[in-house]
Design a protein with these regions (language model features):
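Glycine/threonine-rich phosphate-binding loop and adjacent beta-strand/alpha-helix elements that clamp
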Residues: 24-32, 48-49, 296-297, 321-324, ...
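N-terminal cap/lid segment of alpha/beta-hydrolase-fold proteins
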Residues: 32-67, 441-447
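Short beta-strand/loop motif that positions the catalytic acidic residue
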Residues: 263, 269-271
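Alpha/beta-hydrolase fold nucleophile elbow
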Residues: 138-150
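Glycine-rich nucleophile elbow surrounding the catalytic serine of serine-hydrolase chemistry
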Residues: 149-158
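Accessory cap/linker subdomain of secreted extracellular hydrolases
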Residues: 97, 158-262
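Cap/lid segment of the alpha/beta-hydrolase catalytic domain
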Residues: 65-136, 184-186, 314-323, 466, ...
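Active-site-adjacent alpha-helix of alpha/beta-hydrolase-fold enzymes
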Residues: 279-301
């Protein structure tokens, strides 16, 4: 294992290998970013119409180094138009300064590109046609890399599906990979705030970066199927998402993790512990490493996980927690190493496949795999007296109950969400007065404990309704009293047996649910405690389950549900924690 130790005075790091440290070993990806400037002369072509196979022209900007000859190209395909201009200019300076052509293209149906925009569906063909165009240019040497974040990352994977030989490597940051699970329906519940503000909002801002709507109040509207019209638009893709609440043929083409065998491109996968697409970032890395179409692609997968929300590496603060200067990396150095190898044939820096940030300890660490091979999975049990411990319950019975009222849902406070004002780690104290949250608290830890890996919950519960939701949140309670969310998850009860065939409940019957709560890396300090919060709403992040069994997008009726959570020898509700043994070494460590 190569630990990365940070200076207490400067945002630099010294690598420690075999017990030795030297200033000469400072890793360049942890040094501050340098200013980038255009070379003295650079050739720029703005808004060139590049024709796709169906005749639709996409607005394309090209920046070329002043030197004679042909160059590898870095491509960004964007949907945010003029709002991306400052970043586009920095990308262009960075690329041309380092001997790359830079191509920036506005996606179909956005801003000054022709056609109609429907999220994701045109990006494979349009990406392939754009790669064709780049490879045919006299300034191109036929080698292309792609990079970008969020939708700008999605288009990279979708272009990779084309199998275009010019696409040599990609660097997707915070990209969805399973669009049903991570974009629209996590745990089967509709991702309301993100899908409404993004899916409807972008239509309203095709040519205007501002879209003045109070989303928090606006999405109170019912029925959800007419939410778009209530905001002044009719948005077909938003309606299609609502019309396909189960995983079906609509979503299958957009499960890119399942399509890994169709792709043969090395990828630098970048994610954040508080990013809405964290599971996809990890899933893409894992499936491509096992199932990609070529050995080069399987070996060429890298994973970087920092303490970031969506829109990575922009601030040291995530929610209410400041992780310090050490939490930022020099992404330009990292990208340059990556593309210089795959597009210019230079040696790739010797790095482990996984680089992750351990929160709490606030240290970067290299690992050989994900999940870590040395992980010890521990069951921590919920007890009827409100405690949480590694000891299983001894009583044959144990039940705790609460009322879930969809008209008075638990408000969203932190987590893996897009909205800047809500995402990240927050002290959960503002929710302490609510009686519709069950809380299970551990004793203070006697020694430090690291949790790194996927977290899940096995929950035994019953309701008096035909359908409902269960939410689970893993929280670290600091010795000073603050209670910060680490990971959370949801299961819509009708999808307890899978997301293809919903099954309503029998009121009063006890069911076992598995709640996937994503992943984290956090070291708890001595005196810290773990807490599990169980409830049935997280609004407006997720739509409110009306508890009626009706189609959620069509109904306006809601009912109060009585929820029961079981914690006993017969019904051992528990969280499964990935514990990293102290002073252990990773498998296959260099």
């Amino acid at each position: 294992m190569r630990a990365i130790i940070f200076s207490s005075l400067f945002p630099l790091v010294v690598l420690v290998l075999s017990g030795l440290s030297q200033a000469a070993d400072v890793d360049p990806i942890f040094t501050p970013k340098a200013d980038v400037v255009f070379p003295e002369t650079v050739s720029v072509t703005y808004r060139q119409p590049v024709k796709m196979r169906d005749g639709v022209a996409l607005s394309t900007h090209t920046y070329l180094p002043a030197a004679e000859g042909s160059f590898p190209a870095l491509l960004v395909r964007d949907i945010y138009g003029n709002g991306s201009q400052p970043l586009r200019q920095r990308y262009a300076r960075f690329a041309t300064q380092n001997g790359y052509a830079f191509v920036y293209q506005v996606a179909r149906g956005r801003y000054d590109s022709e056609g109609e925009w429907y999220p994701y569906v045109h990006e494979t063909n349009d990406g392939e046609d754009t790669l064709d165009w780049i490879a045919a240019q006299p300034w191109s040497n036929g080698k292309v890399g792609m990079f970008g974040t969020s939708y700008l990352a999605s288009v990279q994977w979708l272009a990779a599906l084309s199998g275009h030989p010019a696409l040599k490597a990609i660097a997707p940051a915070m990209s969805p990979g399973n669009y049903y699970r991570d974009v629209a329906y996590p745990g089967g519940a509709f991702s309301l705030l993100s899908r409404a503000s993004w899916g409807i909002g972008l239509v309203g801002s095709r040519t205007n970066g501002s879209f003045p709507i109070d989303w928090i109040s606006g999405i109170q509207h019912l029925p959800l199927k007419t939410l778009d019209e209530s905001l002044g638009f009719r948005v077909q893709h938003f309606r299609d998402w609502l019309e396909h609440p189960s995983y079906d043929a609509y979503w299958e083409p957009l499960n890119l993790e399942a399509r890994a065998p169709e792709m043969a491109v090395p990828a630098l996968n970048i994610g954040g512990w508080y990013d809405v697409f964290l599971r996809s970032t990890i899933g893409s890395f894992s499936t491509m490493r096992k199932e990609a179409a070529s050995d080069d692609a399987r070996r060429g997968q890298r994973l970087v996980l920092g303490p970031w929300p969506h829109g990575w590496n922009a601030s040291t603060t995530t929610g209410e927690v400041d992780f310090g200067d050490r939490s930022l990396i020099n992404d330009e150095v990292m990208m340059l190493e990556w593309f210089d190898h795959y597009l210019k044939g230079q040696p790739l820096a010797k790095r482990a496949p996984v680089l992750l940030f351990v929160m709490g300890r606030n240290e970067w660490r290299e690992e050989q795999e994900w999940p870590l091979a040395r992980t010890v999975y521990q069951d921590w049990y919920l007890h009827a007296n409100g405690t949480l411990s590694p000891e299983p319950p001894e009583a044959d019975s144990g039940r705790l109950s609460y009322l879930y009222d969809p008209a008075d849902p638990v408000p969203t406070l932190g987590g893996n969400i897009m909205r800047p004002e809500l995402r990240g780690a927050f002290d959960q104290a503002p929710l302490d007065s609510r009686d519709d949250i069950l809380r299970f608290l551990s004793k203070p830890l006697a020694e430090a404990m690291e949790i790194t890996g996927p977290v899940s919950l096995r929950l035994f519960a019953a309701t008096d309704g035909l359908d409902t939701d269960y939410m689970a949140k893993l929280i670290v309670v600091k010795a000073t009293g603050e209670a910060y969310n680490l990971v959370d998850g949801v299961i819509r009860a009708r999808y307890r047996n899978g997301f293809t065939t919903p099954q309503l409940l029998k009121p009063g019957e006890v069911y076992e649910y598995e709640i996937d709560r994503g992943a984290t890396s956090y070291e708890l300090a001595p005196g810290d405690r773990l807490r599990i919060d169980i409830t049935s709403s997280n609004f407006p992040r997720l739509n409110r389950n009306p508890n009626t069994g009706a189609a959620f997008a069509e109904t306006v009726e809601m009912r109060v549900a009585r929820q029961s959570v079981f914690a006993s020898k017969v019904h051992p509700s528990r969280v499964i924690l990935p514990i990293i043994p102290k002073a252990s070494t990773p498998a296959n460590a260099p």
